[in-house]
């Protein structure tokens, strides 16, 4: 297991930016590919990290680097930063919804999933894991992601973590079991 500490977070130096974080994720995947060329890769992202993980997966798959990505865990994900802006500020009279061109980050899991599906390689299996009492991400976001997986014919599992808030999905036994079962399924011959 490798946990990436993006620039500007935890003990990493530098300033966080979408481009920098994407470079960090790419460097981590390049390291894993050279150090562990036969490893089973499973990328996991929570909330905005799901957008980062799906974008990293798309880039890795498009570059045709071994080992392939076997799984993508998207914990409390949303479709895109822009869709969250609209979800959080739906009122047309508020100026926030018109500010999407000025967002500093534009991660879009829907676009990343399309890139994965269209890459012509074996796509990873996806685990969608929403928290049913998520106070940040509305249910429409997970519905849109699930529909995107269906539309793209991506293999996916969905596990709703009952009663969990936004950051609680994997601190609950149900979420932990869902992740363990997903990884077991990927590892089965």
Language-model segments: what does each one mean?
Residues 1-31:
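Membrane-embedded segments
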Residues 6-10, 79, 165:
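Alpha/beta-hydrolase active-site loop signature
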Residues 45-49, 53:
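Gly/Ala-rich beta-loop-alpha elbow adjacent to hydrolase catalytic centers
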């Amino acid at each position: 297991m490798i946990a990436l500490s993006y620039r500007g977070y935890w003990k990493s130096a530098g300033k966080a930016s979408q481009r920098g974080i994407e470079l960090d994720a790419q460097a981590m995947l390049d390291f894993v590919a050279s150090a562990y060329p036969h490893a089973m890769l499973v990328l996991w992202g929570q909330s905005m990290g799901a957008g980062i993980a799906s974008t990293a997966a798309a880039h890795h798959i498009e570059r045709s680097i071994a080992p392939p990505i076997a799984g993508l865990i998207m914990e409390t994900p949303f479709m895109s930063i822009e869709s969250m802006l609209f979800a959080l500020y739906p009122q047309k009279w508020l100026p926030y919804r018109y500010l999407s061109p000025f967002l500093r980050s534009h991660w879009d899991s829907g676009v990343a999933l399309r890139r994965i599906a269209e890459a012509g390689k074996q796509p990873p299996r996806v685990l969608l894991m929403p928290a049913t009492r998520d106070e940040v991400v509305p249910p429409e976001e997970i519905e849109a992601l699930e529909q995107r997986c269906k539309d793209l014919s991506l293999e996916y599992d969905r596990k709703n973590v009952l009663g969990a808030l936004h950051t609680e999905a994997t601190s609950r036994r149900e979420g932990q079991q869902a992740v363990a079962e997903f990884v077991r399924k990927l590892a089965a011959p």
